[in-house]
């Protein structure tokens, strides 16, 4: 049976084609959804603005400032959700990029046209999670966010609007922590993404009616009993909470980058071990393998820099330093033509890196 008709190769090719079409379909659907999401956000702002202008000209004592402040808070919430969704999409697509590269490495030859090198010229840059389209959308959402914050600051000329400003940010922070709690719960039960989305939508849908019917009375009540010094203290506390949320999000993104880098390292080591087992090495091939191993060492050094030198990560860094020394020793063994010993060194390095991946997975899930 020829290699072209090998059932194993046919299965790999079918998986590759299905995976490729799935990525392209998901990518196109996502940006279409984000375009409609942005149009909906702009349309709501335009409709509410026209309605407020009409009602303020025809009704006395119409609470225009309250409605504009409420709309600004909704803009802040929706723009933050848009930014988070784009970042999560970037991490998902970046993971699929690595899977695609691994499939291409086993299926396609060097002269074939590949997906990832065609679209991304600097795939080795693991910090490039967000592409150009994602940056454009994030810039638009940041612009909407900044305009809304400026509008709230302009309206903050009385105690009522200051409390509205602080209450709105408090609601946003509560929603962020609630979404994180939902994610923690749903990762531990047998469920699907639709139930999570429905739960989040139901929770958010209760906020506008509550704000419409009760926020004005709540503001009047708070203004009657709470001094302004307490309001300032509450805003300061909210700022610290927001900083904590930002720090946790930043840490999660760094852990994702570390995980992807280590998974890429394990895959590259597997490829080198297969070459060492199946191919007779000449001087040119030895230099190619040593060049790949030096790239792996550089990748591990970048991971160590991301982990930092704190006491919390000191043991983990020592383990990765040991893996790096194993790779250095494997280079020496390859130069000395000790192939079996080089394979043993690479297997030990891979074992250390896999343990590190398991530690990161457990810490991220907790």
UniProtKB/Swiss-Prot annotation:
Q: Which GO terms describe its cellular component?
A: plasma membrane
Print the keywords alphabetically: Cell membrane, Membrane, Transmembrane, Transmembrane helix
Record flagged with keyword Secreted = no
Compartments (UniProt record): Cell membrane
Q: Note whether Iron occurs among the keywords.
A: no
Q: How does it sit in the membrane?
A: Multi-pass membrane protein
TM region(s), chain numbering: 30-50, 66-86, 136-156, 162-182, 198-218, 225-245
Mostly located where? membrane
Q: What is this protein called?
A: Uncharacterized protein MJ0976
Protein's organism = Methanocaldococcus jannaschii (strain ATCC 43067 / DSM 2661 / JAL-1 / JCM 10045 / NBRC 100440)
Q: What is the lineage of its organism?
A: Archaea, Methanobacteriati, Methanobacteriota, Methanomada group, Methanococci
